[in-house]
Amino acid sequence: ASDVYKRQHYVRIGLEDGGRLVCGGRRPDDPQLKDGFFYEPTVFADMQPHMRLAREEVFGPILSVFKWSDEDALFEAVNDVDFGLTGAIWTRDLVTAHRAVRRIQTGYVWINNSSQHFMGAPFGGVKQSGIGREECFSELLEFTYSKNVNLKLG
C-alpha cells in the first residue's frame, strides 16, 4: 500500500505546484483491483521544469507533459535535473532523433518506444540514477574485482 500512497502523494504535489491533471490520479474503480497496488495511468499537462513532479524519479504511472518552442531551452531543462535513468524521444525525423540522443543526459534512450528492454543491451542511469549497468556482461563484472599480484622469483 505504501507504493499507492507514494503515487497519491505525487499527484497532490503535481496539483499543488500548478499542474493540470488530464487523466488518472487515483486508484481504479474496478472491485477486482481495489486491494492491489494498482494506480491509474496519470497524465499532468501545463508542467514547468521547476515543478517537483518534473524533477524527481517517481517510478510510477505518472507522466508530466511539457511544451517548448525552443530546442536549446528544451534540452537545458531536461538535463537540469539530478537524475538520468531513461528518456524517450518521439519523432518522425531520424535526424531529430539522433540530435536528441546526443543531447539528452540519460543512460538509456528509446526512440518512438518506451520501457522495452533488450537482452544484452546495457541498462543503467547517469547522475543520481545509479552507477553501473545491468542486463549485460558488464553487470557480472560489477560482482568481481581485479587484483594485481607480483611475485619475485629469486
Residue positions per predicted region:
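Short, small-residue-biased leader/transition segments that mark boundaries at the very start
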Residues: A1-Y5
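Conserved C-terminal structural/oligomerization subdomain of aldehyde/semialdehyde dehydrogenase
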Residues: K34-G154
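Short, solvent-exposed loop/turn elements at beta->coil junctions and helix N-caps
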Residues: G25-Q32
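General beta-strand structural signal in soluble alpha/beta enzymes
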Residues: L21-G24, I111-N113
